[in-house]
């Protein structure tokens, strides 16, 4: 089963484009058993010159780095519990940030979920975040047997990655109980030990794949 990642009203624009392509322009329809959206990166891509001009107009301090340098610096920052604004390539189409316009942080940090919610997203501290994991590593962390490139599937965290609450912690109530670390990746673990997962594939988002791989090595 393949689920359209933008299955709401916004996805109707894709259907309208396809209807025009096939019905008005008389192009033959070909069904594809694979994922033809290839990551759903259908939005605009900004040129470096455009980005530099905008940063300069804001008086922002910035540096130009090679891709290898950029990935190394950002992976190091993430490992030190820094928050990264990740902006690269074409923008995602649909409801989820999938490694093109994303806020990134270390899922192992016990404080990161609260800090991102309160200081960056300006919302309730207990709201969950979702993990991006290399497709070849997903089985080591989650009970998930299928690719989930669009962050649509929820699966339990592996038992050996979970942290069982103590009897005293079980007695806690409300936000105090929600703040208890439930796994080795507490920033992306739901209260029921599940997570909403994005599998990352080098075929569809190579730069994001490289960043996560570098972070893994650190």
Please annotate each region the language model reported.
Residues 2-218:
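Flexible beta->alpha loop and helix N-cap segments adjacent to enzyme active/binding sites
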């Amino acid at each position: 089963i393949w689920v359209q990642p933008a299955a709401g009203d916004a996805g109707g624009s894709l259907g309208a484009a396809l209807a025009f392509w096939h019905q008005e322009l008389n192009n033959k329809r070909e069904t594809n058993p694979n994922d033809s959206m290839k990551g759903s990166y259908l939005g605009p891509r900004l040129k470096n010159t455009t980005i530099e001009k905008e940063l300069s107009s804001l008086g922002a301090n910035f540096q130009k780095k090679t891709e290898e340098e950029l990935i190394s610096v950002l992976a190091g920052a993430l490992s030190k519990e820094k928050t990264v604004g990740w902006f690269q390539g074409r923008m995602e189409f649909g409801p989820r940030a999938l490694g093109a316009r994303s806020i990134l942080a270390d899922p192992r940090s016990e404080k990161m979920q609260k800090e991102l919610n309160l200081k960056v997203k300006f919302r309730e501290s207990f709201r969950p975040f979702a993990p991006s994991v290399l497709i070849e590593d997903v089985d080591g962390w989650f009970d998930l047997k299928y690719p989930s490139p669009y962050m649509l599937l929820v699966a339990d965290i592996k038992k050996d990655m979970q942290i069982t609450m103590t009897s005293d912690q079980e007695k806690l109530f409300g936000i105090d109980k929600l703040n208890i670390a439930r796994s080795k990746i507490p920033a992306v673990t739901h209260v029921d030990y599940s997570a909403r997962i994005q599998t990352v594939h080098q075929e569809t988002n190579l730069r994001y794949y490289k960043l996560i791989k570098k972070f893994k090595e650190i």
